[in-house]
Amino acid sequence: MIAIPDKPYMTLQEYFEWEVQQGCKYEYVNGEVYAMTGGTIPHSAIAVNLSAALRPHVRSRSCRVLSSDAKVAISETGPSFYPDLSITCDSRDRGAIDAICHPCLIVEVLSPSTESYDRGAKFAHYRRLESLREYVLISSDRVNVEIFRLNERHKWELTPYAAGETVQFTSIEFECPIELLYEDVDLSPQDSAQDSPQESSDARTSSQQ
C-alpha cells in the first residue's frame, strides 16, 4: 500500500464517497487512505482458481464468494480492506453496497511487498471481526498455503499445507487438492521446491493469540 500525502482525515463514510471518484482502489486505516498496488499474474491466477473452485460449493450454502473488488469493513468506523477473496454466509451482508462486515473466511495471496503486513498488522485488524473463523495466506512463488483457524478456546491456530496435500476450509466444509490453486500458475523451479507432506504435517503446532 502507498500512503497518500497531505490527505485530510476522513471518516469511513467520507472514504466510501471519496473512493468512488478515484481511478484506483484505496484501503482505509485510522482515517487515512492508502493506494492499492497491482498484483502479479500468478497472484491473480491463484485468486481466480480458488474463487472458481469455491463458487459451486458455497452457492448451496447461501454463502457468497467475493473478489478483491469487495471491501471488508472491520467496524462502523473502519478500517476497511480489500482482501483477495472473502466469503460471507451472514444475512446481514446481503444488502451491503460499500463493504461487507461479517465474513467467515478471508484470503490473502502473498506478495513480497505486502507479506509482512498481511501476516502482522492486517491480520490483527481482521481478528477483530467476530464472524471470522479462518484467515488464509497463499504463497504466490511456491506451493504453500497457511490457514489460521479460530479454535474453541478462541485462539488462532496455524495449519500449513504443502504440495500433495488437501487444503481444508472447515468454516464452510470445503476441501480441494492444493495443486488446484496453482493450476496454470508458472512457478520458477528454485522457488517451487517444497517440504514433504510429512514435514508439513509435523509442523502443525504453531498458534497465534
Q: Where are the regions a protein language model picked out?
A:
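Gly/Pro/Ser/Thr-rich low-complexity, intrinsically disordered segments predominantly at protein N-termini
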Residues: M1-Q209
